[in-house]
């Protein structure tokens, strides 16, 4: 892709470079990407039909799914060619590459506050089994935690997240608190009310403006069109087209074959 030609040069904002990456299950190829750079723009979207490989590719980036072949690297001024595909998931997170649902928490047993505390504690863990002072960790993050809980309407931090929407929102808040360099979000606004969706989008714009690269997968194309600077269209495991939202919306073949007229 033309947008990928800048790979290998110094970049001002973190990028993920995917090269010759493939994944198959039971003989069926679900991801087959020759070359793709994510992060040419502050906020990018991955779209495509069900089974296109979008979520699997995201999970491969954080090594939640092992690669059959290929390499995935983080490109940034501090670490120009960091091989993510050779790292365990927790180490990738310590390098600032964070994906939603990356930390598994039992929402039914932890309060909203405890689950956030768990997230920041795990993120600051320098090596497995190191013992942390949870009070010290919380003290460093308390103001930001309280601000985000208030902003998104989760005012009772001692309550338990019950609905799917509350759990999704809590996961987004955890990602924001971690201040990632590169943030991967899978369906971040699915099931959320319109007012909260707007707040999520506003917060992601602020995060991107501060230097974080954001990549989202979403079937709600209104979110894609209104939030993303660039969009990558995937189908049958391949990255087929890249462009700004307007050019993707006007690509008639893709609209007619995959997205439907109602999404134009």
Regions found by a protein language model. Give the residues of each.
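A short, surface-exposed alpha-helical micro-motif characterized by mixed small hydrophobic
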Residues: 224-226
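Catalytic Walker B motif of ABC-type/P-loop ATPase nucleotide-binding domains
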Residues: 183-186
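ABC ATPase NBD Q-loop/coupling interface
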Residues: 71-93, 132-134
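The feature captures the beta-strand-to-loop junction immediately N-terminal to the Walker
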Residues: 47-49
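H-loop/switch region of ABC-family ATPase nucleotide-binding domains
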Residues: 218-219
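Helix-to-loop junction immediately C-terminal to a conserved catalytic motif
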Residues: 62
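Conserved structural motif at the start of ABC-family nucleotide-binding domains
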Residues: 16, 30-33
């Amino acid at each position: 892709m033309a947008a990928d030609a800048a790979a290998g040069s110094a970049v001002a904002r973190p990028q993920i470079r995917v090269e010759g990456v493939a994944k198959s299950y039971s003989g069926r190829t679900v991801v087959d990407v020759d070359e793709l750079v994510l992060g040419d723009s502050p906020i990018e979207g991955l779209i495509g039909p069900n089974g296109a490989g979008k979520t699997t590719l995201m999970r491969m980036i954080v090594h939640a799914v092992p690669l059959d072949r290929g390499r995935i690297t983080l490109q940034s001024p501090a670490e120009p060619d960091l091989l993510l595909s050779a790292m365990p998931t927790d180490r990738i997170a310590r390098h600032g590459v964070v994906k939603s649902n990356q930390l598994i928490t039992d929402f039914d047993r932890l309060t909203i506050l405890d689950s956030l505390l768990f997230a920041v504690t795990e993120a600051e863990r320098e090596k497995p089994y190191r013992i942390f002072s949870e009070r010290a960790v919380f003290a460093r993050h308390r103001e930001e935690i309280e601000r985000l809980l208030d902003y998104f309407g989760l005012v009772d931090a001692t309550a338990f997240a019950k609905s799917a929407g509350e759990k999704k929102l809590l996961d987004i808040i955890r990602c924001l608190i971690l201040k990632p360099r590169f943030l991967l979000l899978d369906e971040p606004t699915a099931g959320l009310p319109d007012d909260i969706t707007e707040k999520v989008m506003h917060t992601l714009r602020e995060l991107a403006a501060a230097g974080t690269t954001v990549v989202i997968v979403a079937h709600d194309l209104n979110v894609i069109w209104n939030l993303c600077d660039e969009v990558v269209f995937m189908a049958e495991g391949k990255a087929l087209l890249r462009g700004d939202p307007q050019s993707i919306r006007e690509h008639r073949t893709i609209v007619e074959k995959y997205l439907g007229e109602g999404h134009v």
